[in-house]
Every structure is written in structure tokens, then in C-alpha cells.
Amino acid sequence: MDLGKVITAMVTPIHPEKDKVCKKRIHHLVNHLIANGSDGLVVAGTTGESPTLSHDEKIKLFRQVIETNAGRAKLIAGTGSNNTAETIAFTKEVAELGGIDAVLVVAPYYNKPNQDGLYAHFVAVAEASDLPVVIYNIPGRSVVNIEPETIIRLAKLPNIVGVKESSGNLDNISKIIAETPEDFLVYSGDDSLTLPILAVGGDGVISVASHVVGKEMQEMIQAFARGEVQKAASIHRSLLPIMNGLFAVPNPAPTKYLLNQQGISVGPVRLPLVDLNAEQGTKLQAILEGLSK
């Protein structure tokens, strides 16, 4: 399955006065991302502030992204939760919308399941889903790490097509790549590890930085694919400051700040997250401006 190389984990545009998901801003953002290097979009993921979106808001968001996208980019819907039955029901509902290519299912958080529980959770979701499933391993948020052996077992299921790996452990990621089928997709969940993961056989990145440096991310990946390793490495090094800067305070506040500054209105973050203060914004803007020097 081809979901692309640069997949943007899209922020959710919120109307600043009404505190509602905003159709006009979604339309503008989706077009911006597709025009600037995104092969695909993850909708209602971590960067999309999924914990503070209601069920109805997520459905509205999916519908509006599907409408604007019109089949141009691959669409991956975030449907995971720490409730297996709820994840299954929501995934089925999303499949009925049409226009979604896959679902991203996060490791159950807070409950702290063991590896057997994690395996059973993903098997249950995959067997009930009409859409391909991408596993999302993010132990920094979910507390539990999906061990390589568990992902390797899950990769044998026909409906589990890939993993977004945000563990930051290259040894584990290398093991997953080595011991899963050739067509099992392994995406970096960390912008700064995109090139290292490509180097050990990964497929691309589910990116935050691509909101503002999407063309550069795409250029880096394409250079590596052509065998221009030094060029790819040079681009990687040049992008590291902004990749790190976008996580200097909790995501997605920095990304929303830069988009708003660039005239791509996406509104504020929702509590309990807070927007950047003036000093933080000035520092981040300086990092971005430094890329062109």
C-alpha cells in the first residue's frame, strides 16, 4: 500500500472567537499542505489535538477534509483511543464516510496494557475494520511501548499495513524493518529521525515540520531515494533547528503560531494547551527565518 513519503499530521483549525472547528480554515490549510509537499494527511491525530475534539467535531473535521482533498492526497483518520470497543465503533463509523484511505490507531494510553493486551487490542480493531490500520507507537504519551516483537506479530495480519514509530529507538525500529514483510510501512514519528529511519529502510515520515517546511522535507527524502546521500544529509542538518523548535513547547502550539504568522489562519490551541507567549514566538520565528540564510 502506498500512503506517500511525507504525511503531515495536520493541526485542526479552530475559529478564534467561536472555538469551533472552522470549515474555511480547514479548506485553506489542506490546500496549503498539498501544495507544499504533503503526499498525505493524518487528521485528528496528536497534532490535531484529538483529545480536545468531541466525537461530532472529529466527524465534521473528517467530512470537511475529505471534501477539500477531493482525492488528491492520502487521508489517514485518527480513530484510536484507550477503549477497544469505542475504537472499533468509531473506526467503523469513519469507514462509512468514504474518502479515507487508512486509520491511525494509537497504543491505548493510561490503562497500561501489557504486550498481550496491546496485541489483542490491535487484532480486535484490525479484524473489525474495513480500512487498513496503521499502528501508532508513542510511549512518551501512552506510557507503554509496543515492543518490536509485538509489532512484528501484528504485521502478519493482512489489514495492519504499517506503523508510525515515535519511540525514538533506532535499534527497535531497525528490528521492525528487518523482520516485517517488505510491504509493511514504517514511518518515522519524529521529524528529526526521518533521515536515520530512511537509512535503515523506513518508508517516510508522519511529520509536524512539514506544515512549514514541507517542500524541504520532500526534497530531503527524494534526494535520499536518488542516492544523493550527502545532499539529503545537508538538508537534514539545516532543518534540525526548526524540527526541534517546533517542540520547544507542547505541540502543536508552535506550529499553529508559525502558520498564523504566515497568514494561514488556524486559530489557537485548546486548553489545557496554551499558545506561545511573545518571547517564545520571537525565538521560533527567528529559527524559521534563519533557514533561508
UniProtKB/Swiss-Prot annotation:
Site-annotated residues for Part of a proton relay during catalysis: T46, Y110
SUPFAM superfamilies registered for this protein in UniProt: Aldolase (SSF51569)
CDD domains registered for this protein in UniProt: DHDPS
EC code(s) of this entry: 4.3.3.7
GO cellular component, one term: cytosol
InterPro entries, per the entry: Aldolase_TIM, DapA, DapA-like, Schiff_base-form_aldolases_AS, Schiff_base-form_aldolases_CS
Name of the top EC class for this enzyme: lyase
Family: Belongs to the DapA family.
Name the record gives this protein: 4-hydroxy-tetrahydrodipicolinate synthase
